[in-house]
């Protein structure tokens, strides 16, 4: 996948912190999530209590990290940021937990990647605001219970199915983020352009939005590249011509597909006669890992209606045939 269209963080996402919304009012989209979160935040503040633990789940690039920072901002408290893969030993987690002050937010990204020992230490911290640590080794080792300050854990995951039941059940607030509409992305792009001190036409913002795969991170990334084109051609505002020139350079088509996306669909249509084809067979034909194909490439193709999953395998849809200008088989059932 093009580095410009991956929903994962890349080097092209540096220097965008100033574009992040600082409050729920500034946050565009995810209306149901915002309503639930706003209610919980307001109630916690009115009662003077620590906010319940929050799990933010959904595909990458939709704003989970931004929401974690907004939670801390709305509560006017500190946020401590870490991630599942970084917390290797119980001592790593204990050091963070014992440094928290009352009401602080502990944000753990990729929380589904916590190892079992660290996760188990977290259980009592979440539930009782206590941790048990072992002092010494062998027969003389003993467990010491330490009280910690009440805090709010905010966990983010792109794969909520990998969370253990004991961990998931300890979150009082579970919020599922979904892909954004073109209208929402258009507003995000216009806001970003304004903050970058760039004028953008409405039709140009919509053109970028349609290529952003329902993901704000991609929308911002593409807007930055369009701004580069604006600078090079020495124009005074972003219009549709400038957007089209940029997308041509980036090899991104009108549906937001790049060269490898099109290769996936062409492989299914040409080699496997439109499918169904199993994940492993398709991955082998494309020269990628099966997990990479299912987790990185497929979500947008499924969401946009170019690909369908059936009990027998992946199938290219009628939309895929038409987009790639293949003749749709007369006897084919989609």
Curated annotation (Swiss-Prot):
Large ATPase domain (RuvB-L), as annotated region: 1-180
Residues noted as binding DNA in the record, renumbered to the chain: 309, 314
Chain sites annotated for binding ATP: 19-20, 61, 64-66, 127-129, 170, 180, 217
Cellular compartments annotated: Cytoplasm
CDD domains named in the record: AAA
GO biological process, one term: DNA repair
Gene3D superfamilies listed in its UniProt record: 1.10.8.60, P-loop containing nucleotide triphosphate hydrolases, Winged helix-like DNA-binding domain superfamily/Winged helix DNA-binding domain
MF annotations from Gene Ontology: ATP binding; ATP hydrolysis activity; four-way junction DNA binding; four-way junction helicase activity
Keyword Repeat attached: no
Main location: cytoplasm
Taxonomy, superkingdom: Bacteria
Key word Cell membrane present: no
Chain residues that bind Mg(2+): 65
EC number: 3.6.4.-
Main enzyme class: hydrolase
Gene Ontology CC terms: cytoplasm; Holliday junction resolvase complex
Complex formation: Homohexamer. Forms an RuvA(8)-RuvB(12)-Holliday junction (HJ) complex. HJ DNA is sandwiched between 2 RuvA tetramers; dsDNA enters through RuvA and exits via RuvB. An RuvB hexamer assembles on each DNA strand where it exits the tetramer. Each RuvB hexamer is contacted by two RuvA subunits (via domain III) on 2 adjacent RuvB subunits; this complex drives branch migration. In the full resolvosome a probable DNA-RuvA(4)-RuvB(12)-RuvC(2) complex forms which resolves the HJ.
Entry remark concerning the domains of this protein: Has 3 domains, the large (RuvB-L) and small ATPase (RuvB-S) domains and the C-terminal head (RuvB-H) domain. The head domain binds DNA, while the ATPase domains jointly bind ATP, ADP or are empty depending on the state of the subunit in the translocation cycle. During a single DNA translocation step the structure of each domain remains the same, but their relative positions change.
Protein name: Holliday junction branch migration complex subunit RuvB
Natural source organism: Thermotoga petrophila (strain ATCC BAA-488 / DSM 13995 / JCM 10881 / RKU-1)
